[in-house]
A protein has these predicted regions:
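Outer-membrane beta-barrel proteins
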Residues: 2-182
Length: 182
């Protein structure tokens, strides 16, 4: 319950603090390519441009289908778009499996993304990696991701998502979402 309250608080702060330019809600089917275990991942994302910087906030909850547990993480990023490409840095907070004391950890993020008009929609893709300390035991992860957004009505789009994780976490995912632009 504390995590849900924290997520709701972050969402309200994100929208009110810098007037979000967009909000996305997404549900993905995720499959671990090593253990073959699968789960549903739910995302809530907010983003805005403030003083020429791209600010982002992502909240993710994964629920294992076999009932063994939940994973939850929150990431905040800041980037600068140059010639249509946005390199960014950020911080992540992972509660670990089931939020058990001692399993939580923080990590840095570095990434790059960009997009372009493609047919009736917009294609967007990128890659991000966790930047842990050299001797950290926290899991390392690099994610390549892509989204194709199809306009439904003015300022609302339907999103098709794909991603692949590498390093310590090996996952493939696909999903659907909605984005509202403000």
């Amino acid at each position: 319950m504390k995590k849900s309250m924290f997520t709701a608080l972050l969402a309200v702060l994100a929208v009110s603090a810098f007037g979000a330019d967009y909000a996305t809600v997404e549900v993905d089917h995720v499959r671990d390519t090593v253990t073959k275990q699968s789960y549903a991942a739910e995302y809530v994302r907010f983003g805005a441009e403030v003083a020429g910087l791209q600010l982002g906030l992502q909240d993710r909850t994964g629920d294992y289908r076999d009932g063994t547990g939940l994973f939850h993480s929150t990431e905040a990023t800041v980037g600068k778009t140059v010639f249509g490409i946005t390199p960014y840095v950020g911080l992540g907070f992972d509660d670990g499996k089931n939020g058990v004391a001692g399993n939580a950890y923080q990590y840095g993020l570095v990434g790059i993304n960009g997009g372009l008009k493609a047919g009736p929609g917009y294609a967007f893709g990128g890659v991000k990696t966790r930047a842990n300390e050299a001797h950290s035991t926290n899991p390392k992860q690099t994610v390549a991701y892509g989204t194709y957004s199809i306009p439904v009505v003015k300022k609302v789009s339907f999103d098709l998502n794909l991603s692949k994780s590498y390093q310590d976490i090996h996952e493939n995912s696909y999903g659907l979402g909605f984005t509202a632009n403000f």
